[in-house]
Amino acid sequence: MCTSANNRLDQLTQILHPENLLNPTNASHPESSLRPDHPFKIAVVGSGNWGTTIAKIVSENAVARPHLFSHFVNMWVFEEKIDGTNLTEIINTRHENIKYLPGVKLPKNLIAVPDIVKAVKGADLIVFNLPHQFLPRILKQLKGHVPKTTRAISCLKGLEVNANGCKLLSTVIEEELGIACGALSGANLAPEIARGNWSETTVAYRVPADYRGPGKDIDKLVLKALFHRPYFHVNVIDDVAGVSIAGALKNVVALAVGFVEGLGWGDNAKAAVMRVGLLETIKFAKLFFNDAEIDTFTGESAGVADLITTCSGGRNVKVGRYMAETGCAAEEAEKKLLNGQSSQGIVTTKEVHEFLTNVNKLEEFPLFEATYQITFGSESIENLPNLLNNY
């Protein structure tokens, strides 16, 4: 990031002090970005454990920074019954998502909304946070209901693959809705963050060509103010491609780590898989996304830190481990272990295989391909070391 941008972000702690927000003259470095014409309205699309956690964070900041953000934050919830009661009703009365984030108290200004169009109505910023296989249906429902001046952040992990190539999910959102979209990813296990354990993340956002100016539009300072908490530290960069690719491909690597963990091969084997996975992730970025910055993969929470965390636990490792221990199929493991949530590694493994097949590059990514063949083909986990000999 350029020096001036770093300097602006360094001023954030002082500027966001409540006294400085209420009395701009108190701040030695006034920032009009953080004194908008009107408070920005935020909506979150998705209510799994990560979606609910992010909604909790932005709702807390809406209360802490009333000059900057509208008080109420809408969270779109796919309606379902829990013991005969709608999940939205439970969230709005008990202030707890008892299915996907049990035991965590949610802010009272977080409102669960079952109608997605109503949930995002009037939003200046939409945070997308749901399994990426549901994104096409969601965007179809939103098309025509979101003004072009709305901005978005994608917390989704995955890629869109079709006959025309491979796209970032932030790009899909931009193209389908005609709005600017960045990405958020990092070493972020939702249950730890939801309980207030310290963590850090990376937000990537490029200010669009139709940016309306400080105080009138979402920019990097506003995004840092929205997501940064004492327990959740945020770095804002430009590299949307790097953050998105790292967030997608780490789940493939985690699935493979689960395989070797399930066979009891130990930490050395897991480290070997992670090393190869990082190399293949960087190679994938260099080959197919020219604007991705390699420093993102080594220096940001969204890069190697996220890879380490994801491969140390989480749903993809659990699924891979269970498959190795029991010999069951990926879908069966997912259904048994994840309480209705998705293992993004399974979906992304298939998408990466399809894309690499289309561009005739399978042989250059032996770990990604081995993970696919173990998950969907007839390859054995025991043969994994032989498939990685070239590394």
From Swiss-Prot:
Residues given in the record as substrate binding sites: K157, R315, N316
Enzyme class per UniProt: oxidoreductase
GO molecular function, one term: glycerol-3-phosphate dehydrogenase (NAD+) activity
GO biological process: carbohydrate metabolic process; glycerol-3-phosphate catabolic process
Highest rank taxon of the organism: Eukaryota
Gene3D superfamilies: N-(1-d-carboxylethyl)-l-norvaline Dehydrogenase, domain 2, NAD(P)-binding Rossmann-like Domain
Catalyses which reaction(s): sn-glycerol 3-phosphate + NAD(+) = dihydroxyacetone phosphate + NADH + H(+)
Sites where the protein binds NAD(+): G46, S47, G48, N49, W50, G51, F78, F134, A190, R315, Q344
Entry annotation: catalytic residues: K250 (proton acceptor)
Family recorded in the similarity comment: Belongs to the NAD-dependent glycerol-3-phosphate dehydrogenase family.
Protein name: Glycerol-3-phosphate dehydrogenase [NAD(+)]
Organism whose genome encodes this protein: Candida tropicalis
